[in-house]
């Protein structure tokens, strides 16, 4: 797109905005880029703040232009242009929202502003006609009374206090805000001589006041919109604060419980179940080993004692036999055969009986050892099982 065409369209837009008395700054860079954010404020000002007549027409058509996003705002604007202004833009709604089409968008904005100004003139002229007709009727009634009474050419006015005021000027000035004090009645004939210049001044004053009123209302509406937008954020923050306070309370309770547990558990040692079971199994094994070692020691001592006793008994048996053999030819009679036989028989029997006891004790110790082995095997099997608790 040529830069000359853009500059020409921007100049046209500046001229129209001067006629429209646009108070805010224009984003020329955004308009050149085709950014819709630069043109939407101008359109909203033309429809809502420029003319009270146009705003009344929009309110009567039940179209809302405030508190909407860009897409809904453009939908409402296109509907107004179609129904009330008989204007169809060159671009579609999607094209207008997108970036680009700068020259076409500037042209559409200029056309919208011209349509609004034209509609303002039409509506203002329609409201001026009935007021002028009323003034003509009132002036027609006052002319014969003035000719009959031959009132001088001095202008007659009415002060706010209700009294008649005369001035040296030829043109009359009527103050509109009239009220009666002390039941003073004022005739309509005295208020009739009003010139066309005064009418123009009054209409311009009315237009100025009516145009200024929406400018005062717009900030109020914006403030309400901001409050509406801020209220959900405030509620969300309040909920977050309440949740944080609840969590802080829970943390304080947990800290108190931990302190109580620390005080109760002072001097106590915490051990895991698995480690405790392992310790118990090891202790049982050690106890069994100690018992087995003691029994083995006793068995060894017992065997040593038996061996000592056996050796002593054998020595005793051998010594008297030799003595008997040596002393027999000298001093032993024949009758002593029975006694020697009896004396020889007793220690042999005792040795035999003692050997039988040794065999019995060995058998009992072997059985005990077998039982202990079984106990060890059972404990080993129990320790292999992980789910078993002693």
Swiss-Prot record:
GO BP annotations listed: centriole replication; centriole-centriole cohesion; centrosome cycle
Primary location class: cytoplasm
GO molecular function annotations of the record: microtubule binding
Sites of Phosphoserine modification: 331, 345
Residues making up the signal peptide according to the UniProt record: none
Gene Ontology CC terms, in alphabetical order: centriole; centrosome; cytoplasm; midbody; spindle pole
Residues recorded as bearing Phosphothreonine in the entry: 346
Annotated InterPro entries: CEP44, CEP44_CC
Cell compartments where the protein resides: Cytoplasm, Cytoskeleton, Microtubule organizing center, Centrosome; Cytoplasm, Cytoskeleton, Microtubule organizing center, Centrosome, Centriole; Cytoplasm, Cytoskeleton, Spindle pole; Midbody
Residue ranges the record marks as coiled coil: 233-267, 361-385
Domain of life (superkingdom): Eukaryota
Annotated stretches, region: Disordered: 323-347
Chain intervals with Low complexity compositional bias: 335-345
Function per UniProt: Centriole-enriched microtubule-binding protein involved in centriole biogenesis. In collaboration with CEP295 and POC1B, is required for the centriole-to-centrosome conversion by ensuring the formation of bona fide centriole wall. Functions as a linker component that maintains centrosome cohesion. Associates with CROCC and regulates its stability and localization to the centrosome.
Quaternary organization: Interacts with CROCC. Interacts with POC1B; the interaction is direct and recruits POC1B to centriolar microtubules. Binds to centriolar microtubules.
Listed name of the protein: Centrosomal protein of 44 kDa
Species per Swiss-Prot/TrEMBL record: Macaca fascicularis (Crab-eating macaque)
């Amino acid at each position: 797109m040529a830069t000359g065409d853009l500059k020409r369209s921007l100049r046209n837009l500046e001229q129209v905005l001067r006629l429209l008395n646009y108070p805010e700054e224009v984003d020329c860079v955004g308009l050149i880029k085709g950014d819709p954010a630069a043109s939407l404020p101008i359109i909203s000002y033309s429809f809502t703040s420029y003319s009270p007549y146009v705003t009344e027409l929009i309110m009567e058509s039940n179209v809302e232009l405030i508190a909407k996003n860009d897409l809904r705002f453009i939908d409402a604007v296109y509907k107004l242009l179609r129904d009330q202004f008989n204007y169809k833009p060159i671009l579609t709604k999607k094209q207008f929202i997108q970036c680009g089409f700068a020259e076409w968008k500037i042209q559409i904005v200029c056309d919208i502003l011209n349509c609004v100004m034209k509609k303002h003139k039409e509506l203002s002229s329609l409201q001026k006609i009935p007021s002028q007709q009323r003034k003509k009727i009132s002036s027609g009634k006052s002319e014969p009374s003035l000719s009959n009474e031959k009132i001088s050419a001095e202008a007659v006015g009415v002060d706010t206090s209700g009294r008649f005021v005369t001035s040296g000027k030829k043109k009359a000035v009527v103050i509109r805000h009239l009220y009666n004090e002390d039941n003073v009645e004022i005739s309509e004939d005295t208020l009739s001589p009003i010139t066309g210049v005064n009418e123009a001044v009054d209409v311009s004053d009315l237009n100025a006041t009516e145009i200024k009123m929406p400018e005062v209302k717009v900030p109020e509406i914006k403030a309400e919109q901001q409050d509406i937008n801020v209220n959900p954020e405030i509620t969300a923050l309040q909920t977050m604060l309440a949740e944080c306070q609840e969590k802080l309370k829970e943390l304080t309770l947990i800290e108190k419980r931990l302190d109580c547990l620390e005080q109760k558990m002072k001097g106590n040692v915490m051990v895991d179940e698995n480690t405790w079971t392992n310790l118990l199994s090891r202790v049982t094994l050690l106890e069994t080993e100690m018992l087995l070692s003691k029994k083995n020691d006793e068995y060894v001592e017992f065997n040593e004692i038996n061996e000592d006793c056996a050796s002593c008994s054998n020595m005793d048996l051998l010594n008297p036999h030799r003595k008997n053999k040596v002393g027999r030819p000298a001093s032993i009679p024949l009758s002593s055969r029975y006694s020697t036989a009896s004396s020889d028989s007793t220690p042999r029997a005792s040795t035999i009986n003692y050997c039988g006891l040794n065999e019995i004790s060995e058998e009992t110790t072997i059985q005990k050892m077998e039982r202990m082995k079984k106990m060890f095997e059972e404990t080993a099997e129990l320790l292999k099982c992980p789910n078993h608790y002693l």
